[in-house]
Amino acid sequence: MNENDKMKIKEVIVVEGKDDTKRIQMAVNADTLETRGSAISDETLDQIEDLYDKRGVIVFTDPDFSGEKIRKIITEAVPGVKHAFLTKHDAAPSHKGSLGVEHASPEAIREALAHLYTEVPDGEPLISREDLAVAGLTSGPQAKEYRRRLGEYLRIGYTNGKQLYKRLKLFQITPDELKKALEYIKNEDNY
């Protein structure tokens, strides 16, 4: 695929490192900003805020603890950024190593960027904690597995029960979207 055929991304994509940048640029035509790890400096946060104001920002970090830490730091400093998520499967290395955007295929990256979520920091929850409990997402023998599969289906990343509630609220996932996802997940169990 040549440069002219690649999907163009207006926003700046925030990634963790230079290998992530290389992989992103294999998949799409986009500018990136590298955090260089989870110890994000105030200067980097200021840059992200400036870029958010001028072009918009997409946070695209690894689906691991450090990636989630970076995502949280950026979200708190610059509310309203967009988010792209890879599944752990899509970010897994072909050999030994840790999960990372740098291991994702160009197709997986494009798919993640096609399903962005924009934060609604002050949004009212559309789904209650009770709804999540009734759906078996916060307790029970399959809760963890259901959350993992829900995160993959909705492309919002893996969460624990508490994080799931916050993420569904933050991204304003509707009850209908949750219902559709759960039907899909539970139908998978029948195969």
Curated annotation (Swiss-Prot):
Which cofactors? Mg(2+)
Task: Fetch the PROSITE patterns from UniProt.
Answer: TOPRIM
> Binding positions for Mg(2+) 1?
E16, D62
Its EC top class is hydrolase
- One GO molecular-function annotation for this sequence? metal ion binding
- InterPro entries, alphabetized: RNase_M5, RNase_M5_C, TOPRIM_dom, TOPRIM_RNase_M5-like
Q: What is this protein called?
A: Ribonuclease M5 1
